[in-house]
């Protein structure tokens, strides 16, 4: 069962919130959502440029590897990017590339030449510079779209997860990287979570996407979900320094995919605010 949320948590313009009873239901709806965005992008642009995160997010892509999607999607038009990466070798257990390769890419017929991983043979600074150069070249030929408002790359879809501290990609609370306006890709050497060196999209790039989905599960994320979503959230992190709260598309749409545990703080404040939306 999926539920849309309202009242105290009335979604902002072009924002949507979906809550699921189980991981399987979330995976099913996420697959259909990605399929629809892919089909629209291919029809309108001839390409589908999607940026992924690693970690638990990849486990929710499994339905795309099954019927009907593994046969019906035009995988030849998919172009894969990463919104962030740890500065480790591609075969390292903490590599987002490796996690995605093993859990998703190895199971679908995406062309190898359409997979743009981050250089693991360079310093973290050089890897960020290199990745921005690659993306700029693809924007020039419109494999990736371009935002009319700020000339940033306009990915068709950016899929994110959120940490219990409210971080998205490798943008962490109160970090100077949140203030970057002109860079598309940046690097950090002081991540509060290991490994310390990471490459990440900046907020202007994330917010320029046509579609953004934040997929979040677990009761350890519930307070961060509340702070990120609620207009009534208070406390020092809510207004300005919580990265997930700063994800607000410039002219695209944001969809939150939450399980019941992640949404539990929303439930606690507003038990009557939910409307049953769909049953599976």
Swiss-Prot record:
Keyword Hydrolase: yes
GO biological process, one term: pentose-phosphate shunt, oxidative branch
A GO CC term attached to the entry: cytosol
Keywords tagged on the record: Hydrolase
First-level EC class: hydrolase
Reaction equations catalysed: 6-phospho-D-glucono-1,5-lactone + H2O = 6-phospho-D-gluconate + H(+)
Origin: domain of life: Eukaryota
Gene3D superfamilies listed in its UniProt record: 3.40.50.1360
UniProt GO molecular function: 6-phosphogluconolactonase activity
SUPFAM superfamilies cross-referenced by the UniProt entry: NagB/RpiA/CoA transferase-like
Enzyme Commission number(s) of this protein: 3.1.1.31
Key word Hydrolase present: yes
InterPro entries registered for this protein in UniProt: 6-phosphogluconolactonase_DevB, Glc/Gal-6P_isomerase, NagB/RpiA_transferase-like, PGLS
Pathway: Carbohydrate degradation; pentose phosphate pathway; D-ribulose 5-phosphate from D-glucose 6-phosphate (oxidative stage): step 2/3
Stated role: Hydrolysis of 6-phosphogluconolactone to 6-phosphogluconate.
Family according to the record: Belongs to the glucosamine/galactosamine-6-phosphate isomerase family. 6-phosphogluconolactonase subfamily.
Protein name, entry field: Probable 6-phosphogluconolactonase 2
Lineage: Eukaryota, Viridiplantae, Streptophyta, Embryophyta, Tracheophyta
């Amino acid at each position: 069962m999926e539920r849309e949320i309202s009242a105290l948590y009335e979604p902002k313009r072009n924002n949507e919130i979906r809550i699921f009873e189980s991981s399987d239901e979330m995976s099913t709806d996420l697959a259909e959502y990605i399929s629809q965005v892919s089909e629209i992008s291919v029809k309108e642009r001839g390409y589908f440029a999607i940026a992924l995160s690693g970690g638990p997010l990849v486990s929710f892509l499994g339905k795309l590897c099954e019927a009907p999607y593994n046969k019906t999607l035009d995988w030849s038009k998919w172009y894969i990017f990463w919104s962030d990466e740890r500065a480790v070798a591609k075969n390292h257990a903490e590599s987002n590339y490796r996690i995605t390769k093993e859990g998703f890419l190895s199971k679908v017929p995406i062309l190898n030449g359409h997979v743009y991983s981050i250089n693991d043979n360079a310093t973290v600074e050089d890897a960020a510079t290199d990745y921005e150069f690659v993306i700029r070249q693809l924007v020039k030929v419109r494999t990736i779209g371009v935002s009319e408002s700020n000339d940033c790359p306009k990915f068709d879809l950016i899929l994110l997860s959120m940490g219990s501290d409210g971080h998205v990609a490798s943008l962490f609370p109160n970090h100077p990287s949140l203030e970057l306006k002109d860079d598309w890709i940046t690097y950090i050497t002081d991540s509060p979570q290991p490994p310390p060196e990471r490459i990440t999209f900046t907020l202007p790039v994330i917010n320029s996407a046509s579609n953004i989905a934040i997929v979040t599960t677990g009761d350890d994320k519930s307070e961060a979900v509340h702070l990120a979503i609620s207009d009534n959230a208070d406390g020092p992190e809510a207004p300005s320094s919580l990265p997930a709260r700063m994800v607000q598309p410039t002219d695209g749409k944001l969809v939150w995919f939450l399980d019941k545990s992640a949404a539990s703080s929303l439930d606690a404040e507003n038990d009557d605010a939910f409307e049953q939306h769909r049953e599976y």
